[in-house]
Amino acid sequence: MFPMVTGFMNYGQQTVRAARYIGQSFMITLSHANRLPVTIQYPYEKSITSERFRGRIHFEFDKCIACEVCVRVCPIDLPVVHWRLETDIRKKRLLNYSIDFGICIFCGNCVEYCPTNCLSMTEEYELSAYNRHELNYNQIALGRLPMSVIEDYTIRTTRNSTQIKIAMDKPLNARTVTNF
C-alpha cells in the first residue's frame, strides 16, 4: 500500500509540473500577442536597411588609381581591372573596371582596403536578373547611385515599434516601408 501512495504523490507532482510548464508557455504566448507583425509584404513594403548594410558596390571612376588592391584583398579575385601605363607621366590609367555580382560574396574587403575610397557599399539589394550575364556590372553600371528607400516617393515609410501602431483599417494606396 505504501508504494501506491508514493505513486499518487509522483503523479501529483508531475501534474503540477506539467501545469506550471503550460502556464509559462501561455504567458510567453500572451506577451507576444501585443507585438506588431514581423513579416512584411515585400513588393509593397520594404525594410530600411542599416547604415552598415553591405549591398551593391558603388564605383567612382575618377577616384580610382588602378592600384588593384581590391583584387588582391578579394577572397575570390573578383574585380576585373584593365589599365594602361602612361609612360610620359609614369602613372596607370584605368581603362575598364567590372564586378560580377553573380559571384560576389559581398564581404566588403574591397571597400575597406581601397586607398582612395572609390568603392562604397550601397543599400541596394534587389539585384535579381533573368540572365546571369546581366549581373556583370561595368564601371558605368557601378557608377549609378541607387534611389534611397527613404527618398522613393512611391513608398510610404513607417517605423516598426511598440509605441507606433500601424492602422490596419486604413487602405494603403502607397507602398509601405518598415524599419526594424
From Swiss-Prot:
Belongs to the complex I 23 kDa subunit family. Keywords: 4Fe-4S, Chloroplast, Iron, Iron-sulfur, Membrane, Metal-binding, NAD, NADP, Plastid, Plastoquinone, Quinone, Repeat, Thylakoid, Translocase. It is a peripheral membrane protein. It holds the Pfam family Fer4. NCBIfam families: ndhI, NuoI, PRK05888.1-3. Residues 55-84, 95-124 form the 4Fe-4S ferredoxin-type domain. NDH shuttles electrons from NAD(P)H:plastoquinone, via FMN and iron-sulfur (Fe-S) centers, to quinones in the photosynthetic chain and possibly in a chloroplast respiratory chain. The immediate electron acceptor for the enzyme in this species is believed to be plastoquinone. Couples the redox reaction to proton translocation, and thus conserves the redox energy in a proton gradient. Binds 2 [4Fe-4S] clusters per subunit. InterPro entries: 4Fe4S_Fe-S-bd, 4Fe4S_Fe_S_CS, NADH_quinone_OxRdtase_chainI, NDHI. One of its GO terms (cellular component) is chloroplast thylakoid membrane. HAMAP family: NDH1_NuoI. SUPFAM superfamilies: 4Fe-4S ferredoxins. It catalyses: a plastoquinone + NADH + (n+1) H(+)(in) = a plastoquinol + NAD(+) + n H(+)(out); a plastoquinone + NADPH + (n+1) H(+)(in) = a plastoquinol + NADP(+) + n H(+)(out). This is NAD(P)H-quinone oxidoreductase subunit I, chloroplastic. [4Fe-4S] cluster 2 binds at C74, C104, C107, C110. It comes from Calycanthus floridus var. glaucus (Eastern sweetshrub). Its main location: plastid. [4Fe-4S] cluster 1 binds at C64, C67, C70, C114. One of its GO terms (biological process) is photosynthesis, light reaction. NDH is composed of at least 16 different subunits, 5 of which are encoded in the nucleus. It is found in: Plastid, Chloroplast thylakoid membrane. GO terms for molecular function: 4 iron, 4 sulfur cluster binding; iron ion binding; NADH dehydrogenase (ubiquinone) activity; quinone binding. Its EC number is 7.1.1.-. Its cofactor is [4Fe-4S] cluster.
